[in-house]
Amino acid sequence: MARTVFCQKLQKEAEGLGFQLYPGEIGEKIFNNISKEAWAQWQHKQTMLINEKHLNMMDPEHRSFLEQQMVGFLFENKEVEIEGYKPPEK
């Protein structure tokens, strides 16, 4: 049976992550409080940020920036600002 968590991002009970995907205390907080669905949303935003801002994951400053964006998106209900991106019209 799948593990469930109360997802802080989505504010509902949902399927939790299968294992801790991020190291340290932040990773533990993500594992215990973020659903697979919310993590997938973050991965999409993360990819866009890396591409649009030309982030280098070998650069500690870029990793720190991305971590701040991740915490804001997952736990502080902040939207990720991606310059020049316009969502498709429905």
UniProtKB/Swiss-Prot annotation:
<dbReference type="GO" id="GO:0005506">
    <property type="term" value="F:iron ion binding"/>
</dbReference>
<protein>
    <recommendedName>
        <fullName>Probable Fe(2+)-trafficking protein</fullName>
    </recommendedName>
</protein>
<dbReference type="GO" id="GO:0005829">
    <property type="term" value="C:cytosol"/>
</dbReference>
<dbReference type="GO" id="GO:0034599">
    <property type="term" value="P:cellular response to oxidative stress"/>
</dbReference>
<dbReference type="InterPro" id="IPR036766">
    <property type="entry name" value="Fe_traffick_prot_YggX_sf"/>
</dbReference>
<comment type="similarity">
    <text>Belongs to the Fe(2+)-trafficking protein family.</text>
</comment>
<dbReference type="InterPro" id="IPR007457">
    <property type="entry name" value="Fe_traffick_prot_YggX"/>
</dbReference>
<dbReference type="Pfam" id="PF04362">
    <property type="entry name" value="Iron_traffic"/>
</dbReference>
<keyword id="KW-0408">Iron</keyword>
<comment type="function">
    <text>Could be a mediator in iron transactions between iron acquisition and iron-requiring processes, such as synthesis and/or repair of Fe-S clusters in biosynthetic enzymes.</text>
</comment>
